[in-house]
A protein has these predicted regions:
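Short, basic phosphate-binding NTP loop
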Residues: 1-10, 17-30, 164
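Short beta-strand-centered segment that lines the nucleotide-binding/catalytic pocket of NTP-utilizing
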Residues: 30-44, 79-80
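Hydrophobic anchor at the start of a short beta-strand
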Residues: 33, 74-75, 153
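Flexible beta-alpha connector loops of hexameric P-loop NTPases
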Residues: 47-57, 105-114
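Conserved nucleotide-sensing/catalytic segment adjacent to the nucleotide-binding pocket
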Residues: 48-80
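Conserved helix/coil segment N-terminal to the catalytic DExD/H
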Residues: 82-90
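Acidic, Mg2+-coordinating active-site environments of NTP-dependent enzymes
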Residues: 94-174
Length: 174
């Protein structure tokens, strides 16, 4: 993972959407990219169906090696709470990590909501000082994480206007 720019996102909902949107940004800049996520593993134009949101450690390293061999420079990756709890991404060198939302929908694999939150929060808490952590300030539980990471923090919000990035004047159209 050190040989490429790696973006990892955790959330209760929206991980897949975020990884696909991020890949579109990479493509807009003509960056050779890949996706690791719930639906597919995508290495440039090669697509394989996923078995897990975040592959087992050995498989994950195999995918990274294949991406390196194919000169992939940017990867967008979904990081599940179970993968974090089971240390599947331990020593994975993320350049950017994001935690965008949390709700008690997927706590069945954890002893409690607190354990579920702590698993997800570990992506932010263990981010290196050379990386960037993105946090949604509209999620009250995520706000303290800005002080619990060595990473450079970028915050955003729609309701909470104190973020690094704020959203306003939202218009929906069809």
């Amino acid at each position: 993972s050190k040989s490429m720019s790696l973006f990892g996102v955790t959330a209760t909902n929206g991980k897949t959407t975020i990884t696909y949107m991020t890949e579109e940004i990479f493509k807009a800049y003509q960056l050779k990219s890949g996706i690791i996520g719930t639906i597919v593993i995508k290495i440039d134009k090669e697509i394989e169906m996923s078995r897990l949101t975040t592959p087992e450690s050995y498989d994950l390293q195999q995918y990274f090696a294949k991406m390196k061999d194919q000169e992939i420079t940017h990867v967008s990756m979904e990081v599940s709470s179970s993968a974090l709890e089971l240390k599947r991404v331990y020593h994975t060198d993320f350049d950017v990590v994001a935690f965008t939302n949390i709700s008690p929908e997927h706590i069945q694999l954890h002893d409690s909501f607190e354990a579920y939150f702590d698993a997800k929060a570990s992506l932010i808490r263990t981010a290196s000082k050379m990386s960037t952590a993105i946090l949604n300030l509209d999620e009250q539980l995520l706000i303290p994480l800005a002080e619990e990471t060595a990473a450079q923090v970028v915050t955003f919000g729609i309701e909470n206007k104190s973020g690094t990035i704020t959203v306003s004047d939202i218009r929906f159209s069809s």
